[in-house]
Amino acid sequence: MERIKELRNLMSQSRTREILTKTTVDHMAIIKKYTSGRQEKNPSLRMKWMMAMKYPITADRRITEMIPERNEQGQTLWSKMNDAGSDRVMVSPLAVTWWNRNGPMTSTVHYPKIYKTYFEKVERLKHGTFGPVHFRNQVKIRRRVDINPGHADLSAKEAQDVIMEVVFPNEVGARILTSESQLTITKEKKEELQDCKISPLMVAYMLERELVRKTRFLPVAGGTSSVYIEVLHLTQGTCWEQMYTPGGEVRNDDVDQSLIIAARNIVRRAAVSADPLASLLEMCHSTQIGGTRMVDILRQNPTEEQAVNICKAAMGLRISSSFSFAGFTFKRTSGSSVKREEEVLTGNLQTLKIRVHEGYEEFTMVGKRATAILRKTTRRLIQLIVSGRDEQSIAEAIIVAMVFSQEDCMIKAVRGDLNFVNRANQRLNPMHQLLRHFQKDAKVLFQNWGIEHIDNVMGMIGILPDMTPSTEMSMRGVRVSKMGVDEYSSAERVVVSIDRFLRVRDQRGNVLLSPEEVSETQGTEKLTITYSSSMMWEINGPESVLVNTYQWIIRNWETVKIQWSQNPTMLYNKIEFEPFQSLVPKAIRGQYSGFVRTLFQQMRDVLGTFDTTQIIKLLPFAAAPPKQSRMQFSSLTVNVRGSGMRILVRGNSPVFNYNKTTKRLTVLGKDAGTLTEDPDEGTAGVESAVLRGFLILGKEDRRYGPALSINELSNLAKGEKANVLIGQGDVVLVMKRKRDSSILTDSQTATKRIRMAIN
């Protein structure tokens, strides 16, 4: 108050006012401070001071011909004085108002296209719903979040090339547009922006917003998808939150969400196949998400999720150096350890071989609903500070940390045998065995852990074995904090290796990820996921397996047919028949297979019994390892729709129905395709290509000249005979048919005739 009085007193004297307004500032240090460098030192003051002047804005000289000197109120809009140091004129802020009201109108057609991200944001907010405000403590943790909804996922470099190509197509400079997304976007934008009058620089800025993912490290207590982040300032404060439902979704969030679901499904499926790594790669390469190849998305998308990271590792991409255990992301913040195998005894006297980490280490643990700081040393937890949304989440984090600590009292708390298995029916490793055990029931673990008196520390309270909070006592070393633990901020990526069982290791050999870490959570993808791989047929249940198997046979009928006659064993071992086996009752699989294989052999041996539909119908049953038995079947059972349904060996059934006139096959009422007997030239099976339109007369006859190749056959005239070289290097005599009508039956009798002609 004294100071203010003094200042008032000074200001009342005219001399003071004169000094402050008229005299120059001539202290060198001050002049230096405010004039060195291009950076404005006090932007808000500068702005206020400038706007207080009469003509704070400079404009191109042409403006004087387009704007009157005075407005309707008689206020001067521009000065006759030139701007010092340029050939521009000085104008008043009122000139801007006049221009906005009375200036020329240009076409606005490009605005929504250029400012697309803004227009869409307005729509989302218009249709969004804001709920009540709740006052409560907010546990916010800093996470790396996407702050820019509605973007494509191009890298900065890719986007730069696209922008240059769209905005400055004639500029010189090497631009190579390689990825599919780059080409599509460039084409689309060039069309949209024809005759666009908006300044190229503005267009470039806006395109950047649309093409590149921008991330920031922000404190968040709720949803992390970009449509929530754009309203972060409206939905959460230090002590309040406001409920909000976005008024629309954006493709980038949908891609992230669908990518996670696809990756989880693929890793889970690959883990149970004979060669997990090969299967995983095959599935990643043959899957599309929202019409884009999954491998392209993986290369561009920075999502950090366990299954996604396993897929990235398999593709040889770099991933984050943190590791996963029990759904928590662990990042070592200090210390180091060496690993050593040790045998320990559980409370049930079962021996476990665990890899013990020897040495002092500190970690941050970040999960979906809880976070923690963990300090540990060899097989001992020193301190655990947890924060979480609720009691349940806090308990989950405590269990994980206790298991991770490898303490003896945790291992001794095991009651009963540990025999958890993964999806492939293999035993889990000991650490995951312990984890599963205590996740089912942690009562004994918490009771045996031990409790201690605690000091009163700001922001921290104790927690008892029954998960009630306390200010006096707590489980040994464990405290609950009001503050969350920030996610690891660095976006650094490291080179990793992956083994055939999908275990991902860093270059020091530490396991960062394994299929056990992949969440079992099921969700519904926002974008269509198309799995072309037969391994994923079962994802939509037994019916889908059935339909897909038969669709596959029909689509590939030309090659299947040749293999059926020449190399059946190879055909039976095809990976596409693997999912089907799970539909056939286990006890009878072998007998069915033996029966069908015998039936097929008879067809091959006995002329004229070749029956296309029957082969298609029974083929999947022949894929199981056959048991020899004298059993005959008139129908075969498959387990779909929760019960056994019958496929008739001869004739149609609801499961398998072939309409001879339309040549359409329906499986369980679903269309499974049409049997076309006109193969694509060149890709068709060798024999079929020979036979369609030719009659096989018998063994080679030298009188008809040297053997022709299949391609030379097309030159024969109707009724002309020739020797021809077929599949296995055998030569047979054929005659080109005189009539086309009988062509269809050729393929059915041909295989027989070839066999007879050769034998």
Curated annotation (Swiss-Prot):
It comes from the Viruses. Gene3D superfamilies: Polymerase Basic Protein 2, C-terminal domain. GO terms for biological process: 7-methylguanosine mRNA capping; cap snatching; DNA-templated transcription; symbiont-mediated suppression of host cytoplasmic pattern recognition receptor signaling pathway via inhibition of MAVS activity; symbiont-mediated suppression of host gene expression; symbiont-mediated suppression of host mRNA transcription via inhibition of RNA polymerase II activity; viral RNA genome replication. Transmembrane segments: none annotated. Changing residue 482 to R: In strain: A/Fort Monmouth/1/47-MA. It holds the Pfam family Flu_PB2_7th. InterPro entries: Flu_PB2_2nd, Flu_PB2_6th, Flu_PB2_C, Flu_PB2_CAP-bd, Flu_PB2_middle, Flu_PB2_N, INV_PB2, PB2_helical. The record marks 627 as: Mammalian adaptation. It is found in: Virion; Host nucleus; Host mitochondrion. Keywords: Cap snatching, Eukaryotic host gene expression shutoff by virus, Eukaryotic host transcription shutoff by virus, Host gene expression shutoff by virus, Host mitochondrion, Host nucleus, Host-virus interaction, Inhibition of host innate immune response by virus, Inhibition of host MAVS by virus, Inhibition of host RLR pathway by virus, Inhibition of host RNA polymerase II by virus, mRNA capping, mRNA processing, Viral immunoevasion, Viral transcription, Virion. A motif (Nuclear localization signal) lies at residues 736-739. One of its GO terms (molecular function) is RNA-directed RNA polymerase activity. The keyword Signal does not apply. One of its GO terms (cellular component) is virion component. Plays an essential role in transcription initiation and cap-stealing mechanism, in which cellular capped pre-mRNAs are used to generate primers for viral transcription. Recognizes and binds the 7-methylguanosine-containing cap of the target pre-RNA which is subsequently cleaved after 10-13 nucleotides by the viral protein PA. Plays a role in the initiation of the viral genome replication and modulates the activity of the ribonucleoprotein (RNP) complex. Influenza RNA polymerase is composed of three subunits: PB1, PB2 and PA. Interacts (via N-terminus) with PB1 (via C-terminus). Interacts with nucleoprotein NP (via N-terminus). Interacts (via N-terminus) with host MAVS (via N-terminus); this interaction inhibits host innate immune response. Belongs to the influenza viruses PB2 family. This is Polymerase basic protein 2. It comes from Influenza A virus (strain A/Fort Monmouth/1/1947 H1N1).
